[in-house]
């Protein structure tokens, strides 16, 4: 019998442990990049406008922003001018990709490990003043996000999801690791904290399995789906739609569930 955990009760990643959470994901991504052929670096991904190489450039840009928040501010300002039709965060991400545009794929792969090692070493010493800085993504209906939340929680899940993107683009199997559960549970906590739909039980299968209650009151339904597919949906990657099954209860919960989004 599956033990049901209230997602809200999952402990938030503490700043003191953020580097420990990030380290295994960096290792997993590094291993994947080391296996890619020249052709695979050019393959299109589920991220609009980006191929595999662009995703890696974006991830390197995340490392640069974590090490130098002022650079993030500068790129956001310049991105608003260069990409005026994009949301602020999307424009920032494009600026990071542009910054690595002239580098070869092999150079990106070589820079990945040392740059992220710097981030892992620097995280414990990040000051509260920097952690308290906020960034407006520009997405409708969303609040500014704190830098502390980004480095403690989002960096690991964003890289995890982009590892999924690369595997899907290249047809490679997504290699599972012990830290996957922690990444998934932080997403579900954020989902629960912002949830306004009917309470439900979410049963995940695949790379991470288990049961989590979303919402405070008695669940009206149990929804089952593949962990990777469900997290892709929460990130806004809506195609292909995950195969969701209402095990019992009110199937109307699927509407709110499919519309839910979590920051990545």
Across the structure, where does each feature detected by a protein language model lie?
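Hydrophobic packing residues in well-ordered alpha-helices of helical domains and bundles
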Residues: 19-22, 109-112, 152-155, 159
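An N-terminal domain-cap segment
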Residues: 5-57, 66
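Amphipathic, well-ordered alpha-helical segments in soluble domains
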Residues: 25-32, 62, 115, 158
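Short, helix-capping/interhelical loops that line the mouth of catalytic, cofactor-
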Residues: 1-17, 65-124, 134
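Glycine/small-residue-rich hydrophobic helix-like segments
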Residues: 193-233
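Globin-like tetrapyrrole-binding proteins
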Residues: 131
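C-terminal interaction segments
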Residues: 219-264
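Short, contiguous alpha-helical
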Residues: 43-86, 136-196, 230
């Amino acid at each position: 019998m599956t033990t049901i955990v209230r997602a809200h009760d999952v402990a938030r990643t503490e700043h003191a442990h953020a580097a420990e959470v990030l380290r295994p994901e960096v290792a997993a991504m590094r291993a994947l990049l080391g296996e890619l052929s020249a052709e695979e670096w050019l393959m299109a991904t589920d991220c609009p406008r980006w191929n595999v190489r662009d995703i890696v450039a974006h991830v390197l840009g995340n490392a640069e922003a974590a090490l130098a928040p002022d650079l993030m501010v500068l790129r956001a300002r310049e991105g608003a001018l260069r990409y005026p039709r994009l949301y602020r965060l999307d424009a920032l991400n494009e600026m990071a990709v542009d910054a690595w545009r002239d580098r070869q794929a092999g150079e990106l792969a070589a820079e990945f490990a040392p740059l992220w090692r710097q981030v892992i070493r620097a995280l414990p010493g990040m000051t509260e003043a920097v952690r308290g800085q906020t960034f407006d993504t520009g997405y409708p209906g969303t609040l500014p996000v704190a830098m502390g939340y980004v480095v403690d929680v989002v960096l690991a899940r964003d890289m995890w999801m982009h590892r999924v993107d690369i595997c899907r683009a290249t047809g490679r199997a997504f290699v599972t690791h012990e830290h996957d559960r922690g990444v998934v549970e932080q997403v579900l906590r954020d989902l629960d904290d912002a949830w306004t739909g009917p309470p439900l039980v979410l049963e995940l299968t695949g790379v991470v399995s288990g049961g989590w209650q979303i919402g405070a009151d008695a669940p009206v339904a149990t929804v089952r789906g593949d962990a990777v597919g469900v997290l892709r949906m929460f990130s806004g990657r809506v195609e292909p739609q995950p195969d969701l099954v209402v095990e019992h209860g009110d199937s109307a919960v699927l509407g709110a569930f499919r519309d839910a989004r979590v920051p990545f």
